[in-house]
Curated annotation (Swiss-Prot):
It catalyses: (R)-4'-phosphopantetheine + ATP + H(+) = 3'-dephospho-CoA + diphosphate. It is found in: Cytoplasm. Substrate binds at S10, K42, A79, R93. This is Phosphopantetheine adenylyltransferase. CDD domains: PPAT (cd02163). The keyword Nucleotidyltransferase applies. Its main location: cytoplasm. The gene is coaD. Pathway: Cofactor biosynthesis; coenzyme A biosynthesis; CoA from (R)-pantothenate: step 4/5. ATP binds at S10, F11, H18, G94, L95, R96, E104, V129, R130, P131, I132, T133, A134, T135. Its EC number is 2.7.7.3. Transmembrane segments: none annotated. Keywords: ATP-binding, Coenzyme A biosynthesis, Cytoplasm, Magnesium, Nucleotide-binding, Nucleotidyltransferase, Transferase.
Amino acid sequence: MNRTALYAGSFDPVTNGHVDVIRQACRLVPRLVIAIGVHPGKTPLFGAEERAELLREICAPLAAAEGAALDVVTFDDLAVSAARRVGASLFIRGLRDGTDLDYEMQLAGMNGAMAPEVQTVFLPASTGVRPITATLVRQIAAMGGDVRPFVPDLVAERLRARFAKP
């Protein structure tokens, strides 16, 4: 039985919430593929390659500690297409609250209609990371706030450098 899981997102930036979901997923599957969505209409704070580099550096040790293989890829089409390309049989989705659940249930239904062979697995966020969103992290960083409680140290350094006043 194939137990490769795909965790798709923008990861702009990588947050402690993302890392929490990745850690949980690595405990469940022997192989996790983190898929960074690239959308031509959006201008991300960090480019896709930089986000991939950050994810590899931050998450490879976590995956290794759990005995899971970790790959990081980019995609610019449907997540179901990315899942098929990497041979995933599971979608991993993190849930912070009921609002996330409502949205994620719709997404799971649509993905299930397009790719019934790929099952969605919801992982509840750990209590300490539930309020974290990448959008809020970007806003705090842009206004000179301290994002260290919300992101890995490497990401905090990159955000500080990105928003440094000349």
